[in-house]
A protein has these predicted regions:
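Short acidic capping loops at alpha-helix termini that bridge into adjacent secondary structure
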Residues: 18-21, 71, 159-160
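Structural detector of well-ordered beta-strand residues that form the stable sheet scaffold
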Residues: 23, 44, 101-102, 133, ...
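Short, well-ordered alpha-helices that flank and scaffold nucleotide-derived cofactor binding pockets
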Residues: 12, 34, 38, 62, ...
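Short, conserved catalytic or interaction motifs in soluble domains
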Residues: 48, 138, 166
Length: 266
C-alpha cells in the first residue's frame, strides 16, 4: 500500500470515469495524474506559480472561463515541497464550476494557511478539499516503510474508499443483501488490496507524538540554509507567504545554471 493507492481509491470515490476531464499540476510525481488515468479520465495540466510552485489559480480561472461549465469534473492540487494551497480560494473556483478538489498533501503534513476567518487550516482537515492524501514513504515526514492515507469529512466518500481498499468486501450487517450469520461477508464492488499491515500502522502512529517537532526541525534547517545563501545572488531560496506555514519536505532553490551546479555538486 502507498499514497498512489490512496490517490487511486480517492479518484474512484469521487466518481472519475472514462472520458472525464480533470485538471492537475505538472509539478508533481506521476501518481497525482495517473490516479485519474487509472479510472479512464483525461488529465489537463495547468502551469504553476513560479514563486510557490503550486497550480496557478489565475491560469486555472482562465482555462475554466473559456470552457463550458461541466467540461472539467475536478482538480488535483499538490502541496508541492510542503507549501499549502490557500484552499479557500480554490474552493470558491471549484464551487463556481461544480468541481471537486482532491488534495495531494504527501509533502505537507503539518502545513497550514490562514483563511479569511483567521483560522489555521491544516492540510488534511477537510474544511475546503473533498479528499486529502498523505504518504508514508521512507523519505516523508512520517514513514511506515511504505504506505499512504486518504482523509475526508464526506461520509459517502469515506464509505466508498473503505470498500475499495479491501477488495470491495464488507462485513457490515446493514450493508449486506442477506442475513446469513456473523461469518458472512459480501464482495459488492471490484476493489483492491490497498491496506498497510498492523505492524506498519504501529510504526506510523508511534511517530505522531513527534510529528510537530519534526516539522519545526525542518523549518530551523531552512532558516539556516536561507541565512547561508542570503549573500549569494545567484541562488533564489524558497518563498513563504506570511499567512502560510510551510512543512518543507523539500528545500527547492532556483539558479541560472542548474546543470552546471548539478555537475559541480557531483
Amino acid at each position: 500500500c502507498n499514497a498512489t493507492a490512496a490517490l487511486h481509491i480517492a479518484a474512484m470515490a469521487l466518481g472519475v470515469k472514462e472520458g472525464d476531464n480533470v485538471i492537475c499540476t505538472p509539478m508533481t510525481f506521476a501518481s497525482s495524474a495517473n490516479c485519474i488515468r487509472f479510472c479512464g479520465g483525461n488529465v489537463r495540466f495547468v502551469d504553476i506559480d513560479p514563486e510557490t510552485y503550486l497550480l496557478d489559480i489565475n491560469k486555472l480561472k482562465e482555462i475554466l472561463s473559456t470552457a463550458p461549465k461541466g467540461t472539467y469534473k475536478g482538480m488535483v492540487l499538490v502541496d508541492f515541497a510542503g507549501y499549502p494551497h490557500n484552499m479557500e480560494e480554490y474552493r470558491k473556483v471549484a464551487d463556481e464550476y461544480g468541481m471537486w478538489i482532491l488534495e495531494d498533501a504527501c509533502h505537507a503534513p503539518g502545513a497550514y494557511f490562514i483563511d479569511s476567518t483567521g483560522e489555521r487550516v491544516y492540510c488534511g482537515c477537510g474544511k475546503y478539499s473533498d479528499i486529502t492524501v498523505f504518504s508514508f514513504h521512507p523519505v516523508k515526514h512520517i514513514t511506515t516503510g511504505e504506505g499512504g492515507m486518504a482523509c475526508t469529512q464526506n461520509k459517502e466518500y469515506y464509505e466508498k474508499m473503505a470498500l475499495y481498499r479491501t477488495h470491495g468486501i464488507t462485513h457490515e450487517a446493514e450493508k449486506l443483501q442477506r442475513e446469513d450469520g456473523l461469518w458472512y461477508y459480501e464482495m459488492q464492488e471490484l476493489g483492491y488490496n490497498y491496506r498497510i499491515t498492523d505492524i506498519q500502522a504501529a510504526l506510523g502512529t508511534s511517530q505522531l507524538k513527534r510529528a510537530r517537532k519534526n516539522v519545526e526541525i525542518r523549518r530551523e534547517l531552512v532558516r539556516k540554509y536561507n541565512e547561508a545563501f542570503v549573500s549569494i545572488s545567484e541562488i533564489k531560496t524558497p518563498y513563504e507567504a506570511a499567512d502560510v506555514y510551510h512543512a518543507y519536505h523539500l528545500y527547492v532553490i532556483q539558479v541560472e545554471d542548474r546543470l552546471g551546479l548539478y555537475n559541480f555538486l557531483r
